[in-house]
Amino acid sequence: MPHPRGSDRANAREDARAAALAEELGAQLGRLKGAGPKIKQLLSMVQLDRPSDGERSPVGFGALPDGARTIPFGRVRRVIEQDLDARIGRLFDDIDEEPFAVASLGQVHKARTSEGEIVAVKVQHPGVAEAIETDLRSLGLVGPILKRLAPGLDARAILAEIRDRISDEIDFELEAQHQRRLQRLLRSHPHVKVPHVHTDLSSRRVLVTEYVEGLRTDEIKRLGEAERDRIGEVAFRCYLDLAWRAGTVAGDPHPDNCILCPDGRLCLLDFALLRDLDAQSSQGEREVMRALADGDAHRVHERLRHLGYLPNPRSVDPDELLEHLTTGGEWMLARGFRRIDQEYVTRIFELAYPPRSPHFPTMRRMTIPPAALLLRRVEIQLLSLLGDLNAGADWGAITAEHHSRKPASTALGHEEAAFWERHTPG
């Protein structure tokens, strides 16, 4: 058996090597000015580097994030008129020249249609799509660094999935399709609202939707504990229901994409990232969650091997694998009431991500199937959202309703279960 000090030195060398490779990866992504931040957000789902505070809840169309900028309204006008082939005065009776929301891809303006409806006009910044497409063609350059950092990772498949998802984000016509699909699915949902899309006023670079009044997350955080708990449960259940009941992974459950409507419903925004979860993957992921909840190391190992997470199964110890996954997934697995605050979120990230995670040797021997990349992103962003809300519930019991088809554990859960019984997708 190695001497403890020798083992400590070996671990320190491994940590230093991982940190150096992560820094090299960050530098490479930093050269990709258009897509770099988004690639890093998606790569954080592979658990190669601990997300920064900003990456835990990537900023959407709300606050002004680092690197985001507004553009003069004259350029916004040109994009709208070029894409919709009409003068802006014929498209809208009135439009605010100052945007009310900005992100790296574009900005959002409030407007009024000729029918008098107040709408949100999301306009892509000119040149952004071309810059991102150029970056995506260079994405293969980070593959060798990824393989050195995590030899078990199927870097080619992961990068192809990232390329596809980011390409989806810059296509507002595709986002409009996604939003119409979810708006139809959730139209009569008792607790959730999705704004309707004005298809005739939308294009590849312009997306016009219903404008929704309500409280943003910064205001929601000032509400009472009981209301924050309710909102947290609504958000958590909705994204789990979409994945496990509808087979649709909606990949952006972060604070800037949530509005509390005056009627108490939670309005969800931004559906650029959407991926169908096929029946085989869905069943396999459920089986993994059941095995984790049961603490069955060998069943977890077997299910993950079958799903493609373990390229060399013999190199991964089942007990170490179980410890790694139950540590990061504790909040979704453990039964009993838990209030999730920022301190708890920070602790989970420190345990689940290098360089501080004690499970990094196990992570390096794993990969993540492309179909599961957005699913993992949703889980991480939900944890961040619940931490922002300081929301409490028995998250383990709610999760078990989905992976083990347990009866609803709360009154709100019974209402949602009744909705899905009436609206199960065919």
Report residues per predicted region.
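Broad phosphate/nucleotide-binding scaffolds in NTP-utilizing and phosphate-metabolizing enzymes
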Residues: M1-L240, G247, L260-C267, L273-A279, ...
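Catalytic-loop of the protein kinase fold
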Residues: T248-P255
